[in-house]
């Protein structure tokens, strides 16, 4: 049974086409991985099929009474919202029904007997609906899901703006679970999730009987949960049966076959053109030349897609620092309450350290405390000599209205326009991206702009807070290569063992010193 039909969909921004004449069917129970490079339009596609964005052309048709749950990259959680209020908002439609029922009861004293009977019948129908949906057990349901996701210990009255990125993702995921939609749309759900949360999500999706569409650049995760791949590339959407590894096998084979056919056809075209050029003027061979020209005119010429710009990340290294990068003495990190026991840590020159552990235990807070962005609750941090620090934050400020060019120029005012454009292009951004406002780019493209700032500044210590979030496969592979070759030291928060394996000299498990477990 078809849950969703998309026919002849085309969309773009300005003169930049994102996709053209895309058609797509979602069937009951399909577990789909939607893949493609950063900026190919995956999140845009999700926004269109959920009605958040109107397409330039095409038709989107959902089956009747289908409830859609959508977890996107940039869902707004505003100050004043609590964990409990966000989870309870999954039942807003039931609260609306309760309000409608209460309004009916309020009107009963002002109507005649016939009207009263009608209203009572209407109120009874609503009451039955509320009972059927377990309306009077909402608090218990919210508590059950919060406990399963490890949110109950944080407190249901905790403001969502005080949560870590992973904790916010879990709150939004919990809301989806409570909504019990007929289809899940998940846009990079593993960003900010720790290893245990990702394992939990794997189990949940494997047991999920309904359909889902999943955007992810986490290949092991994709391989474990999907049975179909839709590849968004060069404004088209192609379907492949199997997991990501099977898709890559078939995709590379098709690509090689197309290139072989292209080369063979180009050789044939060259020979035909040579024959026509040599023989069209001679009376004896003119007819043969005309025949060859007709063959050329009728030929369906194979076109190869232009190669996507691949990023090149090469970090510049500053002078050698002193022996110690930093030392802490009785350091207790946190905001109002402590997140750690007293820490006596030290990092030496040349170490490449990865911080691991569950969400919300203080990994980002530790980075910010070392940098002096947050004052410790007690204890001290001593930075080493001759440090040139590069810092990569989890997210970019979405209120920024500058273009990519302006963003880099503000950071490096001595650069010429050519140097700015060249620096951005080396990070895998096209001319259209470079001239766009940063905030309209995809999460992966924004990350590349921030990496552009980092690699063009001389550093000898990098503090990286989940740098792989949003990056596509090519960008991740290139970043890993660049960090392995980097001559300086690295302190990095990362939840992807595949990324830091072979890169890290040390792994610090922050759960050993946190007060939150």
Language-model segment annotations:
Residues 250-300, 305:
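Intracellular alpha-helical coupling/juxtamembrane segments of multi-pass membrane proteins
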Residues 313-315:
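Post-kinase regulatory C-tail/linker adjacent to protein kinase catalytic domains
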Residues 1-260, 309, 318-517:
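ABC ATP-binding cassette signature C-motif
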